[in-house]
UniProtKB/Swiss-Prot annotation:
Its main location: cytoplasm. It comes from Clostridium acetobutylicum (strain ATCC 824 / DSM 792 / JCM 1419 / IAM 19013 / LMG 5710 / NBRC 13948 / NRRL B-527 / VKM B-1787 / 2291 / W). It comes from the Bacteria. Transmembrane segments: none annotated. N(2)-acetyl-L-ornithine binds at R133. Keywords: Amino-acid biosynthesis, Aminotransferase, Arginine biosynthesis, Cytoplasm, Pyridoxal phosphate, Transferase. GO terms for biological process: L-arginine biosynthetic process. The modification N6-(pyridoxal phosphate)lysine is found at K244. This is Acetylornithine aminotransferase. PROSITE patterns: AA_TRANSFER_CLASS_3 (PS00600). It is found in: Cytoplasm. Its EC number is 2.6.1.11. GO terms for cellular component: cytoplasm.
Amino acid sequence: MSKSYLMNTYGRFNVTFDKGEGTKLYDKDGNEYIDFVSGVAVNCLGHCNPSIVKAIEEQSSKLMHVSNYYWNENAMELTEILCKNSEFDKVFMCNSGTEAIEAGLKLARKYALLHGDENKKEIIYMDNSFHGRTMGALSVTGQPKYQESFKPLIGAVKSVKFNDLDDIKQKISSKTAAVIVEPIQGEGGIIPAKKEYLKLLRDLCDENNALLIFDEVQCGMGRVGSLFAYQKFEVVPDIVCIAKALGGGFPIGAMLAKESVASSFVPGDHGNTYGGNPLACAVAIAVLKELVDKKVVEINVNEKSKYLFDKLMTLKEKYKVINDVRGMGLLIGVEVACDVKKIINKCFESKLLLITAGKNVVRFLPPLNVSFEEIDKALGIFEESIK
């Protein structure tokens, strides 16, 4: 089958996968791989989870799409589950993380217009951040390599140093409409925000009548050991953006907000064609029931996180090539003092899938229901790659 028809926008590994089950992937020749990428934090319950497969089969034979001119029960049920398991009151449904970010940015601008003045438009973002590749999300992504070819981007945006208390104090002002931050910088190298930094952001936003937006696209939906990442940091934003694991492999995203903020939107302010469709929502409901009702997040993530961290710290003590082990839950970065791509490629050759984050960080993103045995097998391969 020809590869020539796909646009050249990704640097792909030389493998074509044909089947998946749990933490395993199989290529077209039947070779088995351990997947510690999880579709980049998407396949939170592994591949072809029975609950997800059942939801797709049942809903796809009943109703898949009706548009947002009409109500559908699955969208109502999903948004109720999300709100009842968070501090938020309203949900905007979409299809991806970058769409959720765009929705959050637009809501912040509309809120500022209604509750500030015409000059209150500024969005503050973090250096080294990543929020997506659409124009709005790209404009608040603090990595020039993604931005340079697409300037001019949207105006009235300003960057600050991540985790630097003094810098944000100096740059936030009455003109600031919102501050957007990842509780854990993912693409930037798995760098957690300091709790005191997020608390300061909350206080400064309140003082300046600005909104605080958390991008939990990668770190949310159970990945760090709580359903929402903000719950671990004990700082509640005004807006939170989620996607990836929400669909467990099926495209879906959402932007959640408090009623006082969400009410700024009126019909026509924002929308999309597929957001909240019955099929995607049925899948997300199935995912959340596994994560919450069956306590995958509460029990498995926290147990396996401690186990994986402890094992990686042992490797750090044993091998000088490991500079740091950091992260939270099952979002873990191992910073190395060598060419990180060589490690990734060695693991790939030994049938373990890992990816990079930042310049020299190996990113571990196993399914949230990963077993101790699968962790041991993956770490055995990883250790061989760093010897």
